[in-house]
Regions:
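Ligand-binding pockets and gating/stacking loops
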Residues: 3-170
Length: 170
């Protein structure tokens, strides 16, 4: 069976030894980049082919002073259409997307077979809510990135009818 072959492959390889981190990163950006670096190493060394990373809890009170947002993320998401709150929310969302772009760049620069690790990967980045003010869970913005070893056509923006379930993406 395939699982038997996979087990034999794993036994035949030396596992890399990584040093344990010395402490908790001092900024959220450092933490996110560290998580993405570990994920890239795990993919590169084929320790795993699946991973998840949640940027924060659904009701996180995390503030982002490094980008000029002193209010908590969850509170800002209940913006009540206040332009200042909407601007702060846009800054947070942009900040998170920049961190995801860091990961994409990292994978793009790791050779893998006939391309890059990104060419042979499929990644999903998104959110569980489109309008926190209304607790609106429809029209969720999602990014699908990577080449999936030639099985994914990129460079497109797709918009579906309002009643299309997100599960259709999977």
């Amino acid at each position: 069976a395939a699982s038997d072959v996979n087990k034999r492959q794993q036994v035949d390889r030396e596992m890399p030894i990584f040093e344990q981190p010395l402490g908790i990163p001092s900024t959220f950006k450092e933490h996110a980049e560290l998580m993405y670096d570990l994920w890239a190493l795990a993919f590169q060394t084929d320790l795993t082919r699946v991973g998840t990373f949640m940027m924060g809890k659904e009701v996180t009170g995390r503030s982002y002073p490094e980008i000029g947002v002193s209010s908590g993320h969850h509170g800002v998401s209940h913006h009540q259409n206040d332009p200042k709150q909407l601007e702060a929310l846009a800054k947070i969302n942009n900040y998170h997307v920049q961190m995801f772009a860091y990961f994409l760049d990292k994978l793009q620069n790791i050779p893998d077979g006939d391309g890059s690790l990104l060419d042979h990967t499929i990644l999903l980045y998104g959110t569980g809510i489109s309008d926190g003010n209304l607790h609106f869970h429809l029209d969720l913005p999602m990014v699908v990135a990577g080449g999936a070893a030639g099985h994914l056509k990129g460079g497109r923006h797709l918009q579906y009818h309002d009643d299309t379930p997100l599960t259709n993406l999977y």
